[in-house]
Regions:
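Accessory alpha/beta interaction modules
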Residues: 1-167
Length: 167
């Protein structure tokens, strides 16, 4: 089972503790992903290679950042690595795409430092278990307010980023 960040009060976050306890087991995570990822992706994954990898990052500001769970897996018949970033949310957070983009950036930076190019894809997946339905966008570009008359010209310069969501 994955360790929680030092100083984490597990009783203050029982849903997160339960989520991590269950899904840090590769067999449980694989069963979940197989039934919730798009079939075109799930069918290409070599599931026995699914492994939990460290999900803590030290930013350049020396601030430690923790995502919930991170898995690596290879695609069937290839040496291509795929990361599955698994985040648990109990509240609706309109800024979640920004936080996820930060995690993806840290994962790719670490990957580049240790293995160079090409970079592996990182697929963020959010499991929302809260009292309210998820009613905010899962697309990063929707965090921006773009003037109608130049939005089309600005869009190519914004990061294109989306996260999968199970509400």
């Amino acid at each position: 089972m994955e360790d929680f960040p030092p100083g984490t009060d597990l009783t203050a976050h029982p849903n997160d503790a339960f989520f991590k306890a269950i899904f840090s087991e590769p067999e449980q995570a694989a069963a979940f992903f197989k039934s919730h990822l798009p079939a075109t992706i799930a069918d290409r994954i070599d599931w026995p290679t699914l492994a939990v990898v460290p999900a803590s990052f030290v930013k350049s500001s020396l601030q430690q950042v923790h995502s919930d769970l991170l898995f690596s897996v290879t695609l069937a018949g290839r040496e291509t690595l795929l990361y599955l970033l698994f985040e648990h949310q109990s509240t609706v957070d309109p800024t979640l795409p920004l936080r996820l983009l930060g995690y993806v950036g840290e994962i790719l930076t670490q990957q580049h430092k240790s293995h160079g190019l090409p970079l592996p894809p990182v697929m963020p997946f959010v499991l929302h278990q809260g009292p309210d339905h998820w009613n905010v966008s899962t697309d990063f570009e929707d965090l921006f307010e773009l003037p109608d008359d130049i939005a089309e010209d600005l869009l190519p310069f914004l990061p294109k980023f989306h996260h999968a969501l199970l509400d």
